[in-house]
Amino acid sequence: MDAAAIISLLNSTSDRVDQFHVEVYRLSLYGAGIRGMEEETSLFNLFNSLNTSTGDLQLSVSFTVHVLKKFGFTGLAELTRYASPDFNMASSYPKADLLLTVTSFLYDLHPVRERSNALTFISSVYLNGYNYRSVTMPQFVKVMFDKGVIMIGDVSALDSLIKQYRPSFFNEYMERSKLTNTNSTFVSDDATQDNTAPAPTIPDDRATGTVAAEKGQPSAQVNQPPTTGGGNCTVSGSTQTSTNSFNSTNTVTAAGKEEKVSDDVTKGIKFLLMTATDPELKGVLERLKPLDGRDEVIEQFKNGVDLYIGKYGKHPVVVGQSAHTKGQQGSLPAEKVTNKIMEIFKPKYIIAIGVCFGMDGKEVNLGDVIVSDRIADLYNIRVEPGCIKARITDADKAGDTLVSLFRNPRNDIVSVIGKSRRFNMVKPSFDKENAKEVKVHCGPMVSTPALVDDAEFKEKLSKARPDALAGEMEGAGIFLAAKDHKVEAIVIKAVGDLADGKKIEYKDWKPFACQAAAEYVLHHLDDDRTIHM
Protein backbone atom coordinates (compact mmCIF):
# COMPACT_ATOMS: atom_id res chain seq x y z
CA MET A 1 0.00 0.00 0.00
CA ASP A 2 1.21 3.50 -0.86
CA ALA A 3 0.78 5.06 2.58
CA ALA A 4 2.03 8.48 1.46
CA ALA A 5 -0.55 8.66 -1.33
CA ILE A 6 -3.29 7.58 1.04
CA ILE A 7 -2.28 10.25 3.55
CA SER A 8 -2.47 12.90 0.84
CA LEU A 9 -5.87 11.71 -0.36
CA LEU A 10 -7.26 11.53 3.18
CA ASN A 11 -6.00 15.03 3.91
CA SER A 12 -7.80 16.31 0.84
CA THR A 13 -10.96 14.37 1.67
CA SER A 14 -10.93 15.58 5.28
CA ASP A 15 -10.72 19.17 4.04
CA ARG A 16 -13.82 18.69 1.90
CA VAL A 17 -16.01 16.67 4.24
CA ASP A 18 -18.92 18.41 5.95
CA GLN A 19 -20.20 18.01 9.50
CA PHE A 20 -22.94 15.60 8.48
CA HIS A 21 -20.47 13.11 7.02
CA VAL A 22 -18.22 13.44 10.09
CA GLU A 23 -21.23 12.58 12.27
CA VAL A 24 -22.07 9.52 10.17
CA TYR A 25 -18.46 8.37 10.10
CA ARG A 26 -18.21 8.73 13.88
CA LEU A 27 -21.40 6.64 14.21
CA SER A 28 -19.89 3.93 12.02
CA LEU A 29 -16.81 3.80 14.24
CA TYR A 30 -19.08 3.38 17.24
CA GLY A 31 -20.57 0.41 15.38
CA ALA A 32 -17.04 -0.92 14.87
CA GLY A 33 -16.43 -0.90 18.60
CA ILE A 34 -14.23 2.22 18.71
CA ARG A 35 -15.05 4.44 21.69
CA GLY A 36 -14.05 7.82 23.03
CA MET A 37 -14.44 9.73 19.76
CA GLU A 38 -17.54 11.76 20.67
CA GLU A 39 -15.83 15.15 20.48
CA GLU A 40 -13.59 14.48 17.49
CA THR A 41 -14.51 16.55 14.42
CA SER A 42 -11.71 15.64 12.03
CA LEU A 43 -12.29 12.84 9.55
CA PHE A 44 -8.53 12.38 9.34
CA ASN A 45 -8.22 11.81 13.11
CA LEU A 46 -11.22 9.50 13.12
CA PHE A 47 -9.62 7.47 10.34
CA ASN A 48 -6.42 7.33 12.35
CA SER A 49 -8.31 5.76 15.27
CA LEU A 50 -9.88 3.20 12.96
CA ASN A 51 -6.54 2.32 11.40
CA THR A 52 -4.94 1.91 14.83
CA SER A 53 -7.74 -0.46 15.85
CA THR A 54 -7.74 -2.63 12.74
CA GLY A 55 -4.00 -2.70 12.06
CA ASP A 56 -4.90 -2.94 8.39
CA LEU A 57 -4.59 0.17 6.18
CA GLN A 58 -6.48 -1.30 3.23
CA LEU A 59 -9.34 -2.40 5.48
CA SER A 60 -9.52 1.07 7.01
CA VAL A 61 -9.63 2.69 3.57
CA SER A 62 -12.31 0.23 2.45
CA PHE A 63 -14.40 0.99 5.53
CA THR A 64 -14.05 4.75 5.01
CA VAL A 65 -14.92 4.70 1.32
CA HIS A 66 -17.99 2.56 2.02
CA VAL A 67 -19.33 4.95 4.66
CA LEU A 68 -18.76 8.15 2.69
CA LYS A 69 -20.17 6.78 -0.54
CA LYS A 70 -23.25 5.41 1.18
CA PHE A 71 -24.14 8.97 2.12
CA GLY A 72 -23.38 10.62 -1.17
CA PHE A 73 -19.84 11.92 -0.70
CA THR A 74 -18.25 12.20 -4.13
CA GLY A 75 -14.78 12.49 -5.60
CA LEU A 76 -13.52 9.25 -4.05
CA ALA A 77 -12.54 7.36 -7.19
CA GLU A 78 -8.80 7.75 -6.59
CA LEU A 79 -9.01 6.74 -2.92
CA THR A 80 -11.19 3.78 -3.93
CA ARG A 81 -8.21 2.35 -5.80
CA TYR A 82 -6.66 1.52 -2.43
CA ALA A 83 -9.81 -0.14 -1.10
CA SER A 84 -10.51 -3.84 -1.28
CA PRO A 85 -13.15 -4.71 -3.90
CA ASP A 86 -14.24 -7.59 -1.65
CA PHE A 87 -14.94 -5.49 1.44
CA ASN A 88 -18.36 -6.24 2.94
CA MET A 89 -19.58 -4.03 5.77
CA ALA A 90 -22.42 -6.40 6.72
CA SER A 91 -20.10 -9.34 7.41
CA SER A 92 -17.12 -7.39 8.71
CA TYR A 93 -18.92 -4.85 10.91
CA PRO A 94 -22.56 -5.90 11.32
CA LYS A 95 -23.31 -3.29 13.98
CA ALA A 96 -21.92 -0.50 11.82
CA ASP A 97 -23.95 -1.80 8.88
CA LEU A 98 -27.09 -1.72 11.02
CA LEU A 99 -26.50 1.85 12.22
CA LEU A 100 -25.66 3.13 8.76
CA THR A 101 -28.62 1.35 7.18
CA VAL A 102 -31.14 2.79 9.63
CA THR A 103 -29.64 6.27 9.32
CA SER A 104 -29.85 6.03 5.53
CA PHE A 105 -33.45 4.83 5.72
CA LEU A 106 -34.54 7.75 7.91
CA TYR A 107 -32.63 10.31 5.84
CA ASP A 108 -34.21 9.04 2.63
CA LEU A 109 -37.67 9.92 3.90
CA HIS A 110 -39.00 13.04 2.21
CA PRO A 111 -40.48 15.56 2.37
CA VAL A 112 -39.35 16.78 5.78
CA ARG A 113 -42.84 16.24 7.14
CA GLU A 114 -42.65 12.48 6.55
CA ARG A 115 -39.25 12.30 8.21
CA SER A 116 -40.51 14.27 11.18
CA ASN A 117 -43.56 12.00 11.49
CA ALA A 118 -41.34 8.91 11.48
CA LEU A 119 -39.01 10.30 14.16
CA THR A 120 -41.98 11.37 16.27
CA PHE A 121 -43.42 7.85 16.01
CA ILE A 122 -40.16 6.19 17.08
CA SER A 123 -39.66 8.65 19.91
CA SER A 124 -43.18 8.37 21.32
CA VAL A 125 -43.59 4.59 20.96
CA TYR A 126 -40.11 3.37 21.93
CA LEU A 127 -38.19 6.20 23.61
CA ASN A 128 -40.66 7.77 26.04
CA GLY A 129 -40.98 10.94 24.02
CA TYR A 130 -37.23 11.49 23.59
CA ASN A 131 -36.61 14.91 22.02
CA TYR A 132 -35.08 13.91 18.70
CA ARG A 133 -34.64 17.58 17.78
CA SER A 134 -32.02 17.92 20.50
CA VAL A 135 -29.54 15.69 18.65
CA THR A 136 -28.36 15.03 15.12
CA MET A 137 -29.80 12.14 13.15
CA PRO A 138 -26.75 9.84 13.64
CA GLN A 139 -26.91 10.55 17.38
CA PHE A 140 -30.61 9.68 17.41
CA VAL A 141 -29.91 6.35 15.67
CA LYS A 142 -27.25 5.63 18.29
CA VAL A 143 -29.87 6.24 21.00
CA MET A 144 -32.21 3.84 19.20
CA PHE A 145 -29.53 1.14 19.26
CA ASP A 146 -28.50 1.77 22.86
CA LYS A 147 -32.15 1.50 23.96
CA GLY A 148 -32.67 -1.76 22.05
CA VAL A 149 -35.11 -0.35 19.49
CA ILE A 150 -32.95 -1.78 16.69
CA MET A 151 -30.63 -4.77 16.90
CA ILE A 152 -28.33 -6.59 14.51
CA GLY A 153 -30.60 -8.58 12.20
CA ASP A 154 -33.75 -7.12 13.77
CA VAL A 155 -35.33 -3.84 12.68
CA SER A 156 -38.88 -5.07 13.21
CA ALA A 157 -39.63 -2.04 15.39
CA LEU A 158 -39.53 -0.01 12.17
CA ASP A 159 -41.71 -2.46 10.25
CA SER A 160 -44.73 -0.17 10.01
CA LEU A 161 -42.55 2.67 8.75
CA ILE A 162 -40.75 0.39 6.32
CA LYS A 163 -44.00 -0.89 4.82
CA GLN A 164 -45.27 2.67 4.45
CA TYR A 165 -42.18 4.29 2.98
CA ARG A 166 -39.75 1.69 1.64
CA PRO A 167 -41.05 -1.90 1.53
CA SER A 168 -37.85 -3.37 0.11
CA PHE A 169 -35.69 -1.96 2.91
CA PHE A 170 -36.46 -4.72 5.45
CA ASN A 171 -35.81 -7.61 3.08
CA GLU A 172 -32.57 -6.09 1.79
CA TYR A 173 -31.22 -5.63 5.29
CA MET A 174 -32.32 -9.08 6.47
CA GLU A 175 -30.56 -10.72 3.51
CA ARG A 176 -27.33 -8.91 4.39
CA SER A 177 -27.60 -9.69 8.08
CA LYS A 178 -27.73 -13.42 7.35
CA LEU A 179 -24.06 -13.29 6.37
CA THR A 180 -21.85 -15.05 8.88
CA ASN A 181 -19.02 -13.41 10.70
CA THR A 182 -16.57 -16.15 9.71
CA ASN A 183 -13.18 -14.62 9.01
CA SER A 184 -14.73 -11.31 10.07
CA THR A 185 -12.65 -8.33 11.04
CA PHE A 186 -15.36 -7.20 13.46
CA VAL A 187 -14.02 -5.41 16.51
CA SER A 188 -16.27 -6.35 19.42
CA ASP A 189 -17.38 -3.90 22.08
CA ASP A 190 -15.26 -5.73 24.64
CA ALA A 191 -12.13 -5.82 22.52
CA THR A 192 -9.13 -3.99 23.90
CA GLN A 193 -6.20 -2.44 22.15
CA ASP A 194 -3.98 -5.17 23.60
CA ASN A 195 -5.73 -7.79 21.47
CA THR A 196 -4.83 -6.11 18.21
CA ALA A 197 -1.44 -5.12 16.96
CA PRO A 198 -1.81 -1.36 16.38
CA ALA A 199 -1.13 0.00 12.95
CA PRO A 200 1.43 2.77 12.62
CA THR A 201 -0.28 6.06 13.34
CA ILE A 202 -0.58 8.20 10.24
CA PRO A 203 0.83 11.61 11.14
CA ASP A 204 -1.45 14.57 10.72
CA ASP A 205 0.88 17.27 9.45
CA ARG A 206 -1.82 19.69 8.44
CA ALA A 207 -2.12 23.00 10.25
CA THR A 208 -5.39 21.94 11.79
CA GLY A 209 -7.19 18.63 11.98
CA THR A 210 -10.71 19.74 12.65
CA VAL A 211 -13.63 20.17 10.33
CA ALA A 212 -16.55 21.97 11.86
CA ALA A 213 -19.85 23.25 10.61
CA GLU A 214 -19.94 26.88 9.60
CA LYS A 215 -20.57 29.05 12.59
CA GLY A 216 -23.21 31.75 12.66
CA GLN A 217 -26.93 31.46 12.09
CA PRO A 218 -28.84 33.25 9.36
CA SER A 219 -30.04 36.64 10.58
CA ALA A 220 -33.66 37.60 10.68
CA GLN A 221 -33.04 39.99 7.78
CA VAL A 222 -32.19 37.20 5.32
CA ASN A 223 -35.12 35.11 4.10
CA GLN A 224 -34.52 31.38 4.11
CA PRO A 225 -34.95 29.16 1.07
CA PRO A 226 -37.82 26.72 0.61
CA THR A 227 -36.77 23.39 2.10
CA THR A 228 -35.64 20.92 -0.54
CA GLY A 229 -37.25 17.55 0.01
CA GLY A 230 -35.34 14.45 -1.02
CA GLY A 231 -32.16 15.61 0.67
CA ASN A 232 -30.70 14.86 4.04
CA CYS A 233 -31.81 16.89 7.02
CA THR A 234 -29.66 17.30 10.10
CA VAL A 235 -31.98 18.14 12.98
CA SER A 236 -30.48 20.10 15.85
CA GLY A 237 -32.72 21.96 18.24
CA SER A 238 -35.41 23.69 16.23
CA THR A 239 -33.16 24.34 13.24
CA GLN A 240 -33.39 22.11 10.18
CA THR A 241 -30.51 22.26 7.72
CA SER A 242 -30.97 20.66 4.33
CA THR A 243 -28.02 18.80 2.81
CA ASN A 244 -28.87 17.11 -0.45
CA SER A 245 -26.94 13.98 -1.25
CA PHE A 246 -26.41 11.73 -4.23
CA ASN A 247 -27.50 8.16 -3.59
CA SER A 248 -24.31 6.42 -4.59
CA THR A 249 -25.87 2.96 -4.42
CA ASN A 250 -26.72 3.50 -8.09
CA THR A 251 -23.08 4.07 -9.02
CA VAL A 252 -20.46 1.53 -10.00
CA THR A 253 -16.89 2.53 -9.27
CA ALA A 254 -13.93 1.11 -11.12
CA ALA A 255 -11.92 0.14 -8.06
CA GLY A 256 -8.26 -0.43 -8.81
CA LYS A 257 -8.88 -0.55 -12.55
CA GLU A 258 -10.67 1.45 -15.17
CA GLU A 259 -13.89 0.04 -16.57
CA LYS A 260 -13.92 0.08 -20.34
CA VAL A 261 -16.81 2.11 -21.65
CA SER A 262 -17.82 1.03 -25.12
CA ASP A 263 -17.14 3.30 -28.08
CA ASP A 264 -20.87 3.39 -28.78
CA VAL A 265 -21.47 4.92 -25.37
CA THR A 266 -18.63 7.41 -25.76
CA LYS A 267 -19.74 8.47 -29.23
CA GLY A 268 -23.35 8.78 -28.10
CA ILE A 269 -22.55 11.38 -25.43
CA LYS A 270 -23.39 14.84 -26.75
CA PHE A 271 -23.48 16.69 -23.44
CA LEU A 272 -20.81 17.42 -20.86
CA LEU A 273 -22.30 18.73 -17.61
CA MET A 274 -19.61 20.62 -15.68
CA THR A 275 -19.82 21.41 -11.97
CA ALA A 276 -17.32 22.96 -9.58
CA THR A 277 -18.09 22.31 -5.90
CA ASP A 278 -19.44 19.23 -4.13
CA PRO A 279 -22.97 20.69 -3.61
CA GLU A 280 -23.16 21.50 -7.32
CA LEU A 281 -22.07 17.99 -8.24
CA LYS A 282 -24.60 16.46 -5.88
CA GLY A 283 -27.42 18.46 -7.44
CA VAL A 284 -26.62 16.92 -10.81
CA LEU A 285 -25.84 13.38 -9.63
CA GLU A 286 -29.12 13.13 -7.74
CA ARG A 287 -30.85 13.37 -11.11
CA LEU A 288 -28.43 11.20 -13.10
CA LYS A 289 -29.87 7.80 -14.07
CA PRO A 290 -28.14 4.69 -15.41
CA LEU A 291 -27.66 4.44 -19.16
CA ASP A 292 -30.19 2.32 -21.02
CA GLY A 293 -29.43 -1.36 -20.46
CA ARG A 294 -27.43 -0.72 -17.30
CA ASP A 295 -28.39 -1.00 -13.65
CA GLU A 296 -25.94 1.57 -12.36
CA VAL A 297 -24.43 4.93 -13.15
CA ILE A 298 -20.77 4.55 -14.15
CA GLU A 299 -18.13 6.30 -12.04
CA GLN A 300 -14.58 6.40 -13.36
CA PHE A 301 -11.23 8.00 -12.64
CA LYS A 302 -9.63 8.71 -16.00
CA ASN A 303 -7.08 11.21 -17.20
CA GLY A 304 -6.72 12.49 -13.64
CA VAL A 305 -10.38 13.43 -13.19
CA ASP A 306 -13.51 11.86 -11.71
CA LEU A 307 -16.18 11.09 -14.32
CA TYR A 308 -19.82 10.07 -13.99
CA ILE A 309 -21.59 8.59 -17.01
CA GLY A 310 -25.33 8.18 -17.13
CA LYS A 311 -28.57 9.54 -18.52
CA TYR A 312 -29.83 13.05 -17.82
CA GLY A 313 -33.36 13.33 -19.07
CA LYS A 314 -33.41 11.86 -22.57
CA HIS A 315 -29.66 12.13 -23.13
CA PRO A 316 -26.52 10.16 -22.24
CA VAL A 317 -24.12 12.58 -20.56
CA VAL A 318 -20.77 12.74 -18.84
CA VAL A 319 -20.53 14.75 -15.62
CA GLY A 320 -17.33 16.40 -14.42
CA GLN A 321 -16.19 18.38 -11.38
CA SER A 322 -13.39 20.95 -11.34
CA ALA A 323 -13.14 21.96 -7.66
CA HIS A 324 -12.79 19.23 -5.04
CA THR A 325 -11.42 21.88 -2.66
CA LYS A 326 -11.95 25.62 -2.26
CA GLY A 327 -8.48 26.24 -3.62
CA GLN A 328 -9.47 24.61 -6.92
CA GLN A 329 -12.36 26.96 -7.61
CA GLY A 330 -11.95 29.31 -10.53
CA SER A 331 -11.42 29.57 -14.26
CA LEU A 332 -8.04 27.84 -14.65
CA PRO A 333 -8.96 24.55 -12.92
CA ALA A 334 -12.30 24.56 -14.75
CA GLU A 335 -10.58 24.99 -18.12
CA LYS A 336 -8.02 22.29 -17.28
CA VAL A 337 -10.58 19.69 -16.20
CA THR A 338 -12.91 20.48 -19.11
CA ASN A 339 -10.05 20.00 -21.57
CA LYS A 340 -9.12 16.66 -19.98
CA ILE A 341 -12.69 15.40 -20.31
CA MET A 342 -12.92 16.64 -23.89
CA GLU A 343 -9.84 14.54 -24.71
CA ILE A 344 -11.80 11.41 -23.75
CA PHE A 345 -15.29 12.30 -24.97
CA LYS A 346 -16.37 14.39 -27.94
CA PRO A 347 -19.57 16.12 -26.78
CA LYS A 348 -21.18 18.85 -28.88
CA TYR A 349 -22.38 20.85 -25.90
CA ILE A 350 -20.99 21.88 -22.51
CA ILE A 351 -23.37 23.05 -19.79
CA ALA A 352 -21.91 24.51 -16.60
CA ILE A 353 -24.36 24.00 -13.74
CA GLY A 354 -24.18 25.41 -10.24
CA VAL A 355 -24.35 28.52 -8.06
CA CYS A 356 -23.76 32.20 -8.87
CA PHE A 357 -24.16 35.50 -7.04
CA GLY A 358 -26.78 38.05 -8.02
CA MET A 359 -25.56 41.43 -9.23
CA ASP A 360 -28.82 43.37 -8.88
CA GLY A 361 -30.95 42.43 -5.88
CA LYS A 362 -33.91 44.34 -7.29
CA GLU A 363 -34.04 42.37 -10.52
CA VAL A 364 -32.54 39.04 -9.50
CA ASN A 365 -33.63 37.26 -6.33
CA LEU A 366 -32.18 34.44 -4.26
CA GLY A 367 -32.93 31.09 -5.87
CA ASP A 368 -33.53 32.50 -9.37
CA VAL A 369 -31.99 30.64 -12.31
CA ILE A 370 -29.69 32.63 -14.61
CA VAL A 371 -29.16 31.46 -18.19
CA SER A 372 -26.05 33.11 -19.58
CA ASP A 373 -26.25 34.35 -23.14
CA ARG A 374 -22.73 35.78 -22.70
CA ILE A 375 -19.82 35.43 -20.28
CA ALA A 376 -17.79 38.56 -19.54
CA ASP A 377 -14.24 37.58 -18.58
CA LEU A 378 -13.10 39.74 -15.65
CA TYR A 379 -9.95 37.73 -15.01
CA ASN A 380 -7.93 40.18 -17.09
CA ILE A 381 -8.69 43.59 -15.59
CA ARG A 382 -7.14 47.02 -15.15
CA VAL A 383 -7.48 48.44 -11.63
CA GLU A 384 -7.93 52.21 -11.52
CA PRO A 385 -8.78 54.53 -8.60
CA GLY A 386 -12.32 53.71 -7.55
CA CYS A 387 -13.03 51.27 -10.35
CA ILE A 388 -11.92 48.28 -12.40
CA LYS A 389 -12.02 47.93 -16.17
CA ALA A 390 -12.18 44.81 -18.26
CA ARG A 391 -9.20 44.53 -20.62
CA ILE A 392 -11.16 42.02 -22.70
CA THR A 393 -14.15 44.12 -23.67
CA ASP A 394 -15.99 41.60 -25.84
CA ALA A 395 -18.03 39.09 -23.88
CA ASP A 396 -17.97 35.49 -25.13
CA LYS A 397 -21.30 34.42 -26.55
CA ALA A 398 -22.93 31.24 -25.37
CA GLY A 399 -23.77 28.65 -28.01
CA ASP A 400 -26.70 29.66 -30.19
CA THR A 401 -28.36 26.24 -29.99
CA LEU A 402 -28.09 26.15 -26.21
CA VAL A 403 -29.31 29.73 -25.74
CA SER A 404 -32.29 29.01 -27.97
CA LEU A 405 -33.10 25.91 -25.93
CA PHE A 406 -32.79 27.41 -22.46
CA ARG A 407 -33.54 31.13 -22.77
CA ASN A 408 -37.34 31.11 -23.13
CA PRO A 409 -38.80 29.00 -20.33
CA ARG A 410 -42.35 27.84 -20.80
CA ASN A 411 -44.62 28.62 -17.88
CA ASP A 412 -44.83 24.98 -16.89
CA ILE A 413 -41.05 24.79 -16.51
CA VAL A 414 -41.05 27.47 -13.85
CA SER A 415 -43.95 25.72 -12.18
CA VAL A 416 -42.19 22.35 -12.28
CA ILE A 417 -39.18 23.81 -10.49
CA GLY A 418 -41.31 25.56 -7.93
CA LYS A 419 -43.62 22.65 -7.21
CA SER A 420 -41.38 19.63 -7.71
CA ARG A 421 -41.10 17.30 -4.73
CA ARG A 422 -37.44 18.28 -4.61
CA PHE A 423 -38.56 21.81 -3.83
CA ASN A 424 -41.40 21.02 -1.48
CA MET A 425 -42.30 24.25 0.28
CA VAL A 426 -42.83 24.01 4.00
CA LYS A 427 -42.95 27.67 4.98
CA PRO A 428 -46.42 29.17 5.36
CA SER A 429 -45.57 32.57 3.91
CA PHE A 430 -43.48 33.74 0.99
CA ASP A 431 -42.30 37.10 -0.26
CA LYS A 432 -40.27 38.36 -3.20
CA GLU A 433 -37.08 36.65 -2.04
CA ASN A 434 -38.71 33.42 -0.90
CA ALA A 435 -41.18 32.78 -3.71
CA LYS A 436 -43.11 29.63 -4.49
CA GLU A 437 -41.91 29.80 -8.08
CA VAL A 438 -38.33 30.03 -9.26
CA LYS A 439 -37.86 32.79 -11.82
CA VAL A 440 -35.60 32.34 -14.83
CA HIS A 441 -33.56 35.18 -16.37
CA CYS A 442 -31.42 35.23 -19.50
CA GLY A 443 -28.53 37.66 -19.81
CA PRO A 444 -24.81 38.24 -19.33
CA MET A 445 -22.76 36.89 -16.43
CA VAL A 446 -19.36 38.05 -15.25
CA SER A 447 -16.68 35.49 -14.52
CA THR A 448 -14.18 36.57 -11.87
CA PRO A 449 -11.25 34.91 -10.06
CA ALA A 450 -12.47 36.24 -6.71
CA LEU A 451 -15.03 34.71 -4.37
CA VAL A 452 -16.98 37.95 -4.01
CA ASP A 453 -18.59 38.83 -0.67
CA ASP A 454 -18.16 42.59 -0.55
CA ALA A 455 -20.75 45.13 -1.64
CA GLU A 456 -18.17 47.73 -2.71
CA PHE A 457 -16.22 45.29 -4.87
CA LYS A 458 -19.45 43.99 -6.41
CA GLU A 459 -20.35 47.58 -7.26
CA LYS A 460 -17.05 47.90 -9.14
CA LEU A 461 -17.83 44.71 -11.06
CA SER A 462 -21.26 46.09 -11.84
CA LYS A 463 -19.77 49.32 -13.21
CA ALA A 464 -17.37 47.30 -15.35
CA ARG A 465 -20.27 45.25 -16.74
CA PRO A 466 -23.51 47.14 -16.00
CA ASP A 467 -25.54 44.68 -18.09
CA ALA A 468 -24.51 41.62 -16.03
CA LEU A 469 -27.23 39.82 -14.07
CA ALA A 470 -24.92 37.61 -12.02
CA GLY A 471 -21.34 36.56 -11.38
CA GLU A 472 -19.44 33.29 -10.94
CA MET A 473 -15.90 31.87 -11.11
CA GLU A 474 -15.64 29.07 -13.71
CA GLY A 475 -17.47 30.20 -16.85
CA ALA A 476 -14.57 31.98 -18.54
CA GLY A 477 -12.37 28.88 -18.36
CA ILE A 478 -15.12 26.57 -19.60
CA PHE A 479 -15.83 28.91 -22.52
CA LEU A 480 -12.12 28.91 -23.42
CA ALA A 481 -12.07 25.11 -23.45
CA ALA A 482 -15.23 25.05 -25.56
CA LYS A 483 -13.64 27.46 -28.03
CA ASP A 484 -10.51 25.29 -28.25
CA HIS A 485 -12.62 22.23 -29.08
CA LYS A 486 -15.05 24.15 -31.31
CA VAL A 487 -18.17 23.18 -29.34
CA GLU A 488 -21.00 25.17 -27.80
CA ALA A 489 -21.08 26.11 -24.13
CA ILE A 490 -23.47 27.82 -21.74
CA VAL A 491 -23.53 28.62 -18.02
CA ILE A 492 -26.76 27.95 -16.14
CA LYS A 493 -26.53 28.75 -12.46
CA ALA A 494 -28.92 29.79 -9.71
CA VAL A 495 -28.44 32.65 -7.28
CA GLY A 496 -27.07 31.43 -3.94
CA ASP A 497 -26.07 34.82 -2.48
CA LEU A 498 -25.92 38.51 -3.32
CA ALA A 499 -22.16 39.05 -2.71
CA ASP A 500 -22.88 41.84 -0.24
CA GLY A 501 -21.01 40.67 2.85
CA LYS A 502 -23.76 38.29 4.07
CA LYS A 503 -22.54 35.03 2.53
CA ILE A 504 -22.79 33.12 5.82
CA GLU A 505 -26.33 34.37 6.33
CA TYR A 506 -27.24 33.19 2.83
CA LYS A 507 -25.58 29.78 3.27
CA ASP A 508 -28.85 27.80 3.30
CA TRP A 509 -29.61 29.14 -0.18
CA LYS A 510 -26.58 27.41 -1.71
CA PRO A 511 -27.97 23.84 -1.72
CA PHE A 512 -31.31 25.18 -2.95
CA ALA A 513 -29.60 27.03 -5.80
CA CYS A 514 -27.69 23.87 -6.77
CA GLN A 515 -30.95 21.98 -6.97
CA ALA A 516 -32.73 24.74 -8.91
CA ALA A 517 -30.06 24.93 -11.63
CA ALA A 518 -29.80 21.13 -11.94
CA GLU A 519 -33.57 20.73 -12.11
CA TYR A 520 -33.94 23.43 -14.75
CA VAL A 521 -31.38 21.79 -17.02
CA LEU A 522 -32.92 18.36 -16.46
CA HIS A 523 -36.39 19.58 -17.39
CA HIS A 524 -35.14 20.82 -20.76
CA LEU A 525 -33.00 17.77 -21.53
CA ASP A 526 -36.00 15.58 -20.73
CA ASP A 527 -37.96 17.25 -23.53
CA ASP A 528 -38.59 15.04 -26.58
CA ARG A 529 -37.76 18.00 -28.81
CA THR A 530 -34.09 17.80 -27.77
CA ILE A 531 -33.57 14.20 -28.88
CA HIS A 532 -32.13 15.14 -32.28
CA MET A 533 -29.79 17.88 -31.07
Curated annotation (Swiss-Prot):
Any single Gene Ontology cellular-component annotation: cytosol
Compositional bias of kind Polar residues: 218-227
Keyword set includes Hydrolase: yes
Biological process per Gene Ontology, one example term: nucleoside metabolic process
Effect of residue 497 to A: Loss of (d)ATPase hydrolysis (in isolated PNP domain)
Catalytic reactions on record: ATP + H2O = D-ribose 5-triphosphate + adenine; dATP + H2O = 2-deoxyribose 5-triphosphate + adenine
InterPro entries per UniProt: Nucleoside_phosphorylase_d, Nucleoside_phosphorylase_sf
Segments of this protein annotated with the region Disordered: 184-248
Keyword set, alphabetical order: Hydrolase
Top-rank lineage group of the source organism: Eukaryota
Gene3D superfamilies: Nucleoside phosphorylase domain
GO MF terms held by the record: adenosylhomocysteine nucleosidase activity; methylthioadenosine nucleosidase activity
Residue segments, region Death domain: 1-262
Coiled coil (residue ranges): none
Catalytic EC class: hydrolase
Ranges where the record places region Purine nucleoside phosphorylase domain: 263-533
PANTHER family for this protein: 5'-METHYLTHIOADENOSINE/S-ADENOSYLHOMOCYSTEINE NUCLEOSIDASE, 5'-METHYLTHIOADENOSINE_S-ADENOSYLHOMOCYSTEINE NUCLEOSIDASE
Functional note: The C-terminal purine nucleoside phosphorylase (PNP) domain cleaves the N-glycosidic bond of ATP, and to a lesser extent dATP, to release adenine and a sugar triphosphate; has weak activity on ADP and AMP and no activity on dADP, dAMP, adenosine, deoxyadenosine or other (d)NTPs.
Domain remark text: Has 2 domains, an N-terminal death domain and a C-terminal purine nucleoside phosphorylase (PNP) domain; the PNP domain has ATP nucleosidase activity. Expression of the C-terminal domain alone leads to cell death in E.coli.
This protein's name: Death domain-containing ATP nucleosidase
